[in-house]
Swiss-Prot record:
<dbReference type="Pfam" id="PF02547">
    <property type="entry name" value="Queuosine_synth"/>
</dbReference>
<dbReference type="InterPro" id="IPR036100">
    <property type="entry name" value="QueA_sf"/>
</dbReference>
<keyword id="KW-0671">Queuosine biosynthesis</keyword>
<dbReference type="InterPro" id="IPR042118">
    <property type="entry name" value="QueA_dom1"/>
</dbReference>
<dbReference type="InterPro" id="IPR042119">
    <property type="entry name" value="QueA_dom2"/>
</dbReference>
<comment type="similarity">
    <text>Belongs to the QueA family.</text>
</comment>
<comment type="function">
    <text>Transfers and isomerizes the ribose moiety from AdoMet to the 7-aminomethyl group of 7-deazaguanine (preQ1-tRNA) to give epoxyqueuosine (oQ-tRNA).</text>
</comment>
<dbReference type="GO" id="GO:0051075">
    <property type="term" value="F:S-adenosylmethionine:tRNA ribosyltransferase-isomerase activity"/>
</dbReference>
<dbReference type="GO" id="GO:0002099">
    <property type="term" value="P:tRNA wobble guanine modification"/>
</dbReference>
<keyword id="KW-0963">Cytoplasm</keyword>
<keyword id="KW-0949">S-adenosyl-L-methionine</keyword>
<protein>
    <recommendedName>
        <fullName>S-adenosylmethionine:tRNA ribosyltransferase-isomerase</fullName>
        <ecNumber>2.4.99.17</ecNumber>
    </recommendedName>
</protein>
<keyword id="KW-0808">Transferase</keyword>
<comment type="pathway">
    <text>tRNA modification; tRNA-queuosine biosynthesis.</text>
</comment>
<dbReference type="GO" id="GO:0005737">
    <property type="term" value="C:cytoplasm"/>
</dbReference>
<dbReference type="InterPro" id="IPR003699">
    <property type="entry name" value="QueA"/>
</dbReference>
<comment type="subunit">
    <text>Monomer.</text>
</comment>
Length: 351
C-alpha cells in the first residue's frame, strides 16, 4: 500500500485559519461507509444521530502553550516546541536554531527565565528551567499556543480558549483533539438529557502528529509515540454499553487510538503508558463503532486511520464532495460522522 494512495488536492482557501464564532455551528458530513452515501448536515444534528445508551468517548487532554521563543547568550534566535513535560523543571522539546544546542548551552526566555540544555534524546532535547521557576509557570507566562503550521498565522489570545475543548482537564498536549472543538456546553447537555452517555480517556497529542510521512510504502512508516490513559471505569462502561447493544462513538482519532490501544488483547483493558499504534486500511477495530472526526491532511496517518474505518475509496470520494461543497478543512474546520466499515474489505495492515 503506497502513501500516494492517500493523496488529494485541496484548494488553499478551504483551510480554516480561524474558528467559527460558535463552536457547534460547523458543518457535518455524514458518511455511510457501507454504501458510500453522503448527507450534509450541521454539527448540532449529531444529536439526532446518536441514540440513548450510546457512549461518546472524548479525549480530555488539555493543550499547553508549548511554543517558546528565546535566544542563546551569543544572541542567536531559538524556537522551542515542548513535546513532553517530564518533571516540574524539565521538559523534552524540539529546538529550532542555527546550530543544535550542546549540553550546558543556555537559552534565555524573555527576561526572567533560563533554559539549560541537559542532553539530546534522539530528535528531542532535554531542557531544564535553571532560572525563573517551574516548567508550568514558564509556559503559562511566556508560552504561545502551538497552532498547526498550516494555519499560517501567529497565535492570539482567542486561541487560548478556542484551540481547546470545553471539557479539557489534563494538561499535556501540544495539539488539540480537534473533533472535540465542535462541542459546546449546550450540546453536551442535550446529549446527556437524551440519555447518551459520555466517558473520557486521555491521550496527550504530540508534535509528531504534524510530521509528514516520509516513506513511500505505508507499512514502512514508524509512528511517533504519545502518552495515554484509559481507566478501569471507562473499560467497564464500554463493556456495559456493548453488552446492551449500544455503540461506542469515538470523538476524534486520538480517542480511537486510545481505545484501540487498550483493546490490543482483543478486549478493552485499563492502560496507562505510551502508544505508537498505527492504524491503516485492513486494521480490524475491536472497540470503536462510530467516529466523529475533522478533515485531515493529504497523505497523513490520520487520513489512513479514517480510511481504515470507512474504506479509502469512500473517504476520498467524501473528501472530494466536501471540497466541491466548500467545507472548511483541518483543525478549525468542519467535521465528519462515520460508521465503521465491516472488516476484510481491504488488504490487512496495522502496527
Amino acid at each position: 500500500m503506497r502513501v500516494d494512495d492517500f493523496d488529494f488536492e485541496l484548494p488553499p482557501e478551504l483551510i480554516a485559519r480561524r474558528p467559527l464564532a460558535e463552536r457547534s455551528s460547523s458543518r457535518l458530513l455524514c458518511l455511510d461507509a457501507e454504501t458510500g452515501e453522503i448527507n450534509h448536515r450541521g454539527f448540532k444534528d449529531l444529536l439526532g444521530m446518536v441514540n440513548p445508551g450510546d457512549l461518546l468517548v472524548f479525549n480530555d487532554t488539555r493543550v499547553i502553550p508549548a511554543r517558546l521563543f528565546g535566544q542563546k547568550r551569543s544572541g542567536g534566535k531559538v524556537e522551542v516546541m515542548v513535546e513532553r513535560v517530564v518533571s516540574m523543571t524539565e521538559m523534552l522539546a524540539h529546538v529550532r536554531a542555527s546550530k543544535a544546542p550542546k549540553p550546558g548551552v543556555e537559552i534565555l526566555i524573555e527576561e526572567n527565565y533560563v533554559l539549560t540544555m541537559v542532553e539530546r534524546e534522539g530528535d528531542l532535547f532535554r531542557l531544564r528551567v535553571s532560572q525563573g521557576g517551574s516548567v508550568s509557570e514558564l509556559l503559562e507566562r511566556c508560552g504561545h499556543m502551538p497552532l498547526p503550521p498550516y494555519i499560517d498565522r501567529e497565535d492570539d489570545l482567542s486561541d487560548r480558549e478556542r484551540y481547546q475543548t470545553v471539557y479539557s482537564r489534563q494538561p499535556g498536549a501540544v495539539a488539540a483533539p480537534t473533533a472535540g472543538l465542535h462541542f459546546d456546553e449546550a450540546l453536551l447537555l442535550a446529549m446527556s438529557q437524551k440519555g447518551v452517555e459520555t466517558a473520557f480517556v486521555t491521550l496527550h497529542v504530540g508534535a509528531g502528529t504534524f510530521q509528514p510521512v516520509r516513506v513511500d510504502v505505508v507499512q514502512d512508516h514508524q509512528m511517533h509515540s504519545e502518552y495515554l490513559e484509559v481507566s478501569a471505569d471507562v473499560c467497564e462502561r464500554v463493556r456495559q454499553v456493548k453488552a446492551a447493544g449500544g455503540r461506542v462513538v469515538a470523538v476524534g482519532t486520538t480517542a480511537v487510538r486510545a481505545l484501540e490501544t487498550a483493546s490490543r488483547s482483543g478486549s478493552i483493558e485499563p492502560y496507562a503508558g505510551d502508544t505508537s499504534i498505527f492504524i491503516y486500511p485492513g486494521y480490524e477495530f475491536v472497540t470503536v463503532d462510530a467516529l466523529v472526526t475533522n478533515f485531515h491532511l493529504p497523505k497523513s496517518t490520520l487520513l489512513m486511520l479514517v480510511s481504515a474505518f470507512a474504506g479509502r475509496e469512500h473517504i476520498l470520494a467524501a473528501y472530494q464532495e466536501a471540497i466541491e461543497q466548500r467545507y472548511r478543512f483541518f483543525s478549525y474546520g468542519d467535521a465528519m460522522f462515520l460508521h465503521r466499515r465491516q472488516s476484510g474489505l481491504e488488504d490487512a495492515g496495522a502496527n
